[in-house]
Amino acid sequence: MKEAKRKKLEEKGWKVGTVAEFLDLTPEETTLIEIKLALSRHLKERRQKSMTQTVLAEKLHSSQPRIAKAENGDASVSIELLIRAMLATGATPQEIGEVIAQVG
């Protein structure tokens, strides 16, 4: 948010902060969320290049709606499923590590 806009809101009595502050997240929780979102974005990019959500779901013995949730960063999706899905699209452990390393 631009500083001028922040000041105007604060002058009108609004409290301005980050999502992490609002949700009272620890730095570790914030980083974990950022990692999951990065994995979700990269999963969607990789999957769109090579297969449908249905095909990926079949490879993982999962469902298409679950893959959609994984690609959209749904909080109910585990990091394990995200990593398994990335591997099923052909990602290497090194590529997955690079995605995680870019967070922060």
Explain the meaning of each model-derived region.
Residues K49-K69:
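Short alpha-helical DNA-recognition segment
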Residues H61, N72-G73, A101:
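Residue-level detection of the helix-turn-helix DNA-binding "recognition helix"
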Residues K69, G73, R84:
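Alpha-helical DNA-recognition elements
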Residues M1-A38, E98-G104:
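N-terminal flexible/basic segments that precede or flank functional cores
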Residues Q48, K59, D74-V77, A88:
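Helix-turn-helix/winged-helix DNA-binding modules
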Residues A38-L39, S62:
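Alpha-helix N-cap/N′ positions at the starts of helices
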Residues S78-I96:
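DNA major-groove recognition helix of helix-turn-helix/homeodomain DNA-binding modules
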Residues K12, L39-V55, R84:
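Short basic helix-loop element that most often maps to the first helix and adjoining turn
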